[in-house]
């Protein structure tokens, strides 16, 4: 399995006041919703502002230190973090999973940018930054499909490995399962990827909200790819073999991309606004908060 790479960079506003809470085992958890708008050029040449809301968490002592800084809703921050995959048993039965942002660092900006008032009572930052870079192995053979308008779309799921030491000093490995969506030429150019292939994906982090068959509101997080690099098999492997996975398939989206080859890979520009579950009418990230696990007690830090 390729040695994983997992980076998230956000610049946005705190949509509301952050919160500090404690798990049943006494672990501090600092939680904030960082919100902004991405400015993208569509396939038709028009500029669009795509709103996003991402839940960000800091754990342990750093959470308490962050809380002491007394950040409040409307403050602009820069976040450096990683995508964190969690899976747990749902109270109603069955397994549930979620991907959210684990912040490694959060700093307040020295200037106050333009804020957009949200009808739901929060704010988001105009001209924000939302960048993701992940490297891992494809977990299953992707299938290309086409929208009624003829746009190609490819859904990829990759396994990103993370090595760390637990509280007892033992070396551990954890795998994060990340879903990504590729559009148009980018999808066509990457349709030959196969299970186990190492791949690097760059893009923007988006949320998608939907209602399940039981009427419950759900939320998922994925990467909308802007550039993908297929890597040589065996390069940068931390060990031999492949970690199989069966994460839930991503939902259908409504965005597209125009792509061009760059340095052996392909880079794309998103066009029409994606169904991110973050409409400008409110703090829609709240719709799927039940998708997040209630405790972080099993985390190693």
Curated annotation (Swiss-Prot):
It comes from the Bacteria. Disruption phenotype: Essential, it cannot be knocked out. As SSB levels are depleted growth slows, tolerance to ionizing radiation and UV light decreases rapidly. Cannot be complemented by ddrB. A motif (Important for interaction with partner proteins) lies at residues 296-301. Keywords: Cytoplasm, DNA damage, DNA recombination, DNA repair, DNA replication, DNA-binding, Repeat. Residues 264-278 have a biased composition (Polar residues). It is found in: Cytoplasm. Signal peptide: none annotated. GO terms for molecular function: enzyme activator activity; single-stranded DNA binding. Residues 238-301 are annotated as: Disordered. Residues 238-260 have a biased composition (Low complexity). Induction: Constitutively expressed, highly up-regulated following ionizing radiation for at least 12 hours (at protein level). GO terms for cellular component: cytoplasm; nucleoid. CDD domains: SSB_OBF (cd04496). InterPro entries: NA-bd_OB-fold, Primosome_PriB/ssb, ssDNA-bd. Gene3D superfamilies: Nucleic acid-binding proteins. Plays an important role in DNA replication, recombination and repair. Binds to ssDNA and to an array of partner proteins to recruit them to their sites of action during DNA metabolism. Essential for ionizing radiation resistance. Stimulates the 5'-3' DNA helicase activity of RecD-like helicase. Stimulates RecA protein-promoted DNA three-strand exchange reactions in vitro with both D.radiodurans and E.coli-derived RecA. Complements an ssb deletion in E.coli, but does not complement a ddrb disruption in D.radiodurans. PANTHER family: SINGLE-STRANDED DNA-BINDING PROTEIN. This is Single-stranded DNA-binding protein. The gene is ssb.
